[in-house]
Amino acid sequence: MASPPRHGPPGPASGDGPNLNNNNNNNNHSVRKCGYLRKQKHGHKRFFVLRGPGAGGDEATAGGGSAPQPPRLEYYESEKKWRSKAGAPKRVIALDCCLNINKRADAKHKYLIALYTKDEYFAVAAENEQEQEGWYRALTDLVSEGRAAAGDAPPAAAPAASCSASLPGALGGSAGAAGAEDSYGLVAPATAAYREVWQVNLKPKGLGQSKNLTGVYRLCLSARTIGFVKLNCEQPSVTLQLMNIRRCGHSDSFFFIEVGRSAVTGPGELWMQADDSVVAQNIHETILEAMKALKELFEFRPRSKSQSSGSSATHPISVPGARRHHHLVNLPPSQTGLVRRSRTDSLAATPPAAKCSSCRVRTASEGDGGAAAGAAAAGARPVSVAGSPLSPGPVRAPLSRSHTLSGGCGGRGSKVALLPAGGALQHSRSMSMPVAHSPPAATSPGSLSSSSGHGSGSYPPPPGPHPPLPHPLHHGPGQRPSSGSASASGSPSDPGFMSLDEYGSSPGDLRAFCSHRSNTPESIAETPPARDGGGGGEFYGYMTMDRPLSHCGRSYRRVSGDAAQDLDRGLRKRTYSLTTPARQRPVPQPSSASLDEYTLMRATFSGSAGRLCPSCPASSPKVAYHPYPEDYGDIEIGSHRSSSSNLGADDGYMPMTPGAALAGSGSGSCRSDDYMPMSPASVSAPKQILQPRAAAAAAAAVPSAGPAGPAPTSAAGRTFPASGGGYKASSPAESSPEDSGYMRMWCGSKLSMEHADGKLLPNGDYLNVSPSDAVTTGTPPDFFSAALHPGGEPLRGVPGCCYSSLPRSYKAPYTCGGDSDQYVLMSSPVGRILEEERLEPQATPGPSQAASAFGAGPTQPPHPVVPSPVRPSGGRPEGFLGQRGRAVRPTRLSLEGLPSLPSMHEYPLPPEPKSPGEYINIDFGEPGARLSPPAPPLLASAASSSSLLSASSPASSLGSGTPGTSSDSRQRSPLSDYMNLDFSSPKSPKPGAPSGHPVGSLDGLLSPEASSPYPPLPPRPSASPSSSLQPPPPPPAPGELYRLPPASAVATAQGPGAASSLSSDTGDNGDYTEMAFGVAATPPQPIAAPPKPEAARVASPTSGVKRLSLMEQVSGVEAFLQASQPPDPHRGAKVIRADPQGGRRRHSSETFSSTTTVTPVSPSFAHNPKRHNSASVENVSLRKSSEGGVGVGPGGGDEPPTSPRQLQPAPPLAPQGRPWTPGQPGGLVGCPGSGGSPMRRETSAGFQNGLNYIAIDVREEPGLPPQPQPPPPPLPQPGDKSSWGRTRSLGGLISAVGVGSTGGGCGGPGPGALPPANTYASIDFLSHHLKEATIVKE
């Protein structure tokens, strides 16, 4: 406002002598005070005249009259000139344009009175404090009178609440009541009264430079903010919340403020220069005092719970504790930006009719309106922010901080009378104290508050007439007071910007019972829950962040379609702590001003219908709630499909509690489980994990298949849906394979649990991180899939822990069903799985036939129980593999994935991050069966790399396809970082075994010609009576690498039905290290060990470590035996170390030890000198040894043969067993009752290195006599060791299955002989005779 024009020439002097201290004897009736004061800058005395509003004073009269003049301060050169009216005043300062009037002091003057206008700063110095006070009081009184005369504020507001003057027009037309705090706001008008104002010069340093805040500004301090008002500007350029100030200080004449990240400017410092050091110190002290006062105010009530904001300029704040107030009209966040709701303790204010329905009155406490003591009239209750009405009570009244009474909006403009609360109450904030539940209060029609205060979207009144409020504090039973909030705060710099209840609730909001809601967000558990009456299964007022109770395991759903359009707007919403009446809520009206700016985040689900695990009510401190639709759009976040409010909606939350399995109730009710339980420990028994696949072909194979099969139940008793969301269940027992929006994380694109309709993953938005399937069907490996009932009902088992995190993402060239299988499955590249190869070409026998064929005998239950690590292979319908050409179980090693050590169940540890090379494939194959060279899988030659990939490997994401088909020619990603150990024994099959049951050497079991990707080895002379018709070629030198023949030769040499095109692409083998251990008919040779004296080998720092030696006399399967040894605490897994010699390729990270010997590593932590952190398996060594009476053949010397063919077959000696001794840790996992010690990470040598371990379970089959192995039949018959082939490599779950018909060495033939699987893979090396395993004790 411009200064008034200078007056005309003064009239003649009155002749009265000057009266410096009593100036009012002047004839000028408008003069309030006059006297001599000094100017600040130079100290010159001038005669000052303070005039009130009038017609221009005597000067105007003398000049013939003029327009009315505002209050002003004039000064003349002397009193004589003023009295003589000899000239115009030297200067006139209009008081109505002053930002503030303050008492000041500087280095020169102790008693200053400073006037700050928008364009200048003017200060005068009094002689003493009394004179200063007199002038200051006169100035401030005049300002207050002018404000009252202008009608800008009620006269009662005139006295200043602090030392700052209440200036006219402070509220710019607000109807609020007063005090200096009326004007506290994020964006305060220039006419607002500030507590303190200083003129400072912002320096181009820190934020001043980055935010272009330089030059002369007014530093304006209010109760909660400081603003920088540039000269000639009406509004502050920057307003900082006092709560955002990290620290402040002054040095000399400089004052600086450091603000945090929540400030509008961002973090940084603002440096400003005051007139002198005294002013700088005064600024510092004053701001510190204001900050302390604010801190003390909010210490009474935690910041995180203060939830309200006075609505804009319409709500005066009469409590000094208020954080801030908004002074702009309510703008949507799209215009004002995301700003945090302010916390205000405003008494009552009513939004003017002009604000219409988009303004909402907010109370200081959201959902917590306590009645002030003075307001506790009969039934009178202050309204809480979201309208949670609370019964007033003496207990709550003293603590009440909700003094804003929500008045009518929407043009009704019914003003709410100010609540005459005591001063103490005005400063108090309501704590969360128990209050009696009372009926909802009526809201003035049309204003429901968004608890954020960012936008004032409000619901219009429900249709129909709305009677006026009979009393400002009285509300009808059907309505609930709403809180209107101003969304003018333009920045998230509001103090308490990160309060907890910003994001949905105060800490105790939701702690009510199911179907109950605490009316007060701040009352923890003491507040009686309000029964939600007509919510239709919705709980109003608070969003439950808990997972809904679900009966069908379908816990969470996506946003319902009707709310999809509001999603984008909902994203702007920062806080979801919405509160609405528990009874009725006004009908939403999309046309309300800022309703479209928000979406209603609804968590609707009825009762426990959305409960994920009805039997686990204690999974969260919070239980079921009902949604609180407020002024947001309609995002349904938790509506169960069976929910009465929104069916088919999907809540976007996932259960994070371990062990909460999705209860399966069919695919119809649980179709879109988008999220997965993340608990690795909720693992079913291994039999659940190892369920055989249930495919359409298998279902067709068994005529008795019926749709009425029982739902699968895990060992834990959980049932699993046949369909579910797309996130994978990290725990083997939990998942819903039905894809709904996200790509499946387990191995095939089409899960077996999905129905035979072949529904593939609909979208490729997320990459399938599971091993890609080897077959086009895309069904996951067996241990992921469901088992098939003999009746043909595919068990809808839940996929187990799939290998979703391999060391590197190998882009498989072949994607199953369109899935982008980006991770390689560590499948055995050396051949098909034993059982699959035998059974694949075979017709599906009856359940009993399958059981007997697997050696389980009639004792095998018809229901194919999921195999435990040593389950008999009976009970698996052979048609599974025969018709689908798939491996039974992936031959992979996922050291982190599937818990498979039965005795490790008590020690589930989270998987460590993988490093390349942590997957080791150990293939115990007999060259006499199908491997052209004794150890073909050695990837020494790039040309042989593709041949090594077993097409039958079920989960080979390397691109292997169905065996016998051209899909085998797919290129595969390089098998880098992996190590393949092939224990190929040239030993011939043992005579005496029925031709239909090839038992004995692994390769005989693993390599029927029809299915083997490798051609049978050429016959070689063998003096052994047990030599096969097709003797294998001479074994290689131990540790010597073999190169496969060209793929064409391999394919040509293969028998009928073999894979016709093993891809001959010489893909990069990367760092895949193959260790072939060709065990000749001679005594065992050291694996991958150069000639070294036995003493040198044994004499290592790891003395006392037991070495597991594979003897040549036994076939690969029989090489490992299990005896009933007592537990050995030091029996830890041994890291397999690849020998760098022989052309083996090692990963650059030296995943495997570079030692030239397979040095055993002591399980003691002190004895692991050669351990590498990335090693995953500990030393398993084939030792050359003549112990046990084993004869030494030509190749049995210390010096390994120089050529793979150099070894001549030696007559195998009679197997001589070496009894296990208690100190011999041959098997890490003992059978139940066999005294095997559990493998523990604590006892493992690599425990401190974060290694994953493999338990090598050496099992004994004393009842099974050696049986000769006939030539591989076209249709191999299952044998005793039939299922061992699936575990010949350290696959993802290496559990040796298939015990002889006469009883297993561990647990008997029945399934589930071992305890449930746990987090570590176990290798069960079953063997017939204990004598055939040699354990060298150092």
Swiss-Prot record:
Sequence ranges of Polar residues compositional bias: 1174-1183
Residues modified to Phosphothreonine: T350, T520, T527, T579, T580, T779, T1082, T1159
Motif position, YXXM motif 7: 1072-1075
Bias kind Low complexity: ranges: 19-28, 444-453, 475-493, 703-719, 938-967, 1150-1165
InterPro entries registered for this protein in UniProt: IRS (IPR039011), IRS_PTB (IPR002404), PH-like_dom_sf (IPR011993), PH_domain (IPR001849)
Protein modification: Phosphorylation fluctuates in a cell-cycle dependent manner with hyperphosphorylation during mitosis. Phosphorylated at Ser-560 and Ser-1109 by PLK1; these phosphorylations prevent the activation of the PI3K pathway upon growth factor stimulation by inhibiting the binding between IRS2 and the PI3K pathway components and increasing the level of IRS2 protein degradation. In addition, they prevent premature mitotic exit.
Domain IRS-type PTB: 194-298
Residues carrying Phosphoserine: 306, 346, 365, 384, 388, 391, 523, 560, 577, 594, 608, 620, 679, 682, 735-736, 770, 805, 828, 915, 973, 1100, 1109, 1162, 1174, 1176, 1186, 1203
Disulfide bond keyword on record: no
Quaternary structure annotation from Swiss-Prot or TrEMBL: Interacts with PHIP. Interacts with SH2B1; this interaction enhances leptin-induced activation of the PI3-kinase pathway. Interacts with GRB2. Interacts with PIK3R1. Interacts with DVL2; this interaction promotes the Wnt/beta-catenin signaling pathway.
Protein name: Insulin receptor substrate 2
Classification lineage: Eukaryota, Metazoa, Chordata, Craniata, Vertebrata
